[in-house]
Amino acid sequence: MSGGTFPTSPAFTSVNIQANNPSIVTLASSGRRQVKTQNTQFWSFKATLPPMTRAQWAPIAAFIMTQRGPRFPFNVQLPQYSFTQGNLNSPHVVEINGAHDAGDTTISLNAWTDSGKSTTLTQTDGLKAGDFISFAPDHNKVYMVIEDVDFSSGSGSLTIEPGLQVDVSGGEGLVYDNVSWNVFLMNDTQEFQMNAGNTVGYELEFREVL
């Protein structure tokens, strides 16, 4: 067994999220600055679970053991970040309108009020700046919404960072709730803290797979 989805219970009590943009900065004696970026971006996290009983801890420990340190990628949802702050909700359906190339930061969207796509959606603040989204079904990268998104007669314009990491096709779905990150453990060694009262504490670090 490997991969899979990190258990959702108990939920993380805190999550520290980092946006990483690998760059090389050169400072000349004149004070001029040169920056070379690698045109890639990834998220990394430090997450803490609440004190757990042995029964709560056991399935989490078993899951972590199957990952064999950083070897296998797995999916994780973060209760603090995996859901939109906007007014989109199930069964609203949002799809990409037309093909977009890797590097694009503005994405045209179509939206409907129902899964049958019988009625186009008009909704202010459908998505909010700071939301996290991804594209279905085979695009694992997670992006941040940079500007609020309104939908008028089924159309909307989405601004994201970073730019698209791969080309996307028209009709691909937008995931705005239950967003999952595809990640791997950062450390070879995983440490579980046994506390007074027979509770277990656990903090883990993981990084987005590109």
Residue ranges and their predicted role:
Residues M1-L210:
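Extracellular/virion structural assembly segments
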